[in-house]
From Swiss-Prot:
The gene is cnxH. The lineage of its organism: Eukaryota, Fungi, Dikarya, Ascomycota, Pezizomycotina. It is an enzyme of class 2 (transferase). This is Molybdopterin synthase catalytic subunit. Its EC number is 2.8.1.12. Gene3D superfamilies: Molybdopterin biosynthesis MoaE subunit. It comes from the Eukaryota.
């Protein structure tokens, strides 16, 4: 996984990548002669959401913080369930229909702990990790950005209108990077009164 950012610590592996996810690679990261069970969860982009056709999902993240959050979740779950190992990788960028956006693998001496830990890792990741997704709908629907958690309320994105009207701050328009991942450190405010 060439363009991955990863953290590895005490039987925990976490990563963010723009590449395709490989389930076998992730299973091998937790494989051990001490483990009697390996559980794999693969979150896959489906073709609909709320009765609307989905074209693709796009994910963005505050990567340094997201990696730390993922590692913290993995370490907590590793100890809580007495796991052998745990690994979690989240894909960023465009994830087409039928492709995985997240893989979580856990290994344990016994299957019950592995099942419980895998589900808990997923729920914690969706609740706490700094990853956001844009659901791109087919037809005239456009897209909606939302937190990467079940039931999160999204904000409709109209690409044409978004480009036409800048957000207004107290000192004038706020200029933002034009696409996720573009360089920039938050909104830039141009003060028209100061001529900057």
């Amino acid at each position: 996984m060439a363009s991955s950012k990863e953290l590895i610590e005490e039987n925990c592996y976490v990563a963010l990548t723009h590449e395709h996810l490989d389930a076998k690679v992730m299973m091998d990261k937790v494989r051990s002669p001490k483990a009697g069970a390996i559980v794999l969860f693969a979150g896959t982009t489906r073709d609909n959401f709320g009765g609307k056709p989905v074209k693709e999902l796009q994910y963005t993240s505050y990567e340094p913080r997201a990696l730390q959050s993922m590692l913290s979740i993995c370490k907590t779950i590793l100890h809580k369930h007495s796991l052998t190992s745990i690994a979690m990788i989240h894909r960023l960028g465009v994830v087409p229909i039928g492709e995985e956006s997240i893989l979580i693998t856990v290994s344990s001496p016994h299957r019950q702990a592995a099942w419980r830990a895998g589900e808990e890792a997923l729920e914690e990741c969706k609740e706490k990790v700094e990853v956001w997704k844009k659901e791109e709908f087919g037809g005239e629907e456009g897209g909606i950005w939302r937190a990467n958690r079940d039931g999160a309320v999204g904000e409709r994105v109209d690409e044409d209108e978004e480009k036409k009207k800048p957000d207004m701050g107290p000192h004038g328009p706020i200029l933002r990077p034009s696409r996720p991942g573009e360089r920039g450190h938050g909104p830039v405010v141009r003060n028209h009164q100061l001529g900057s």
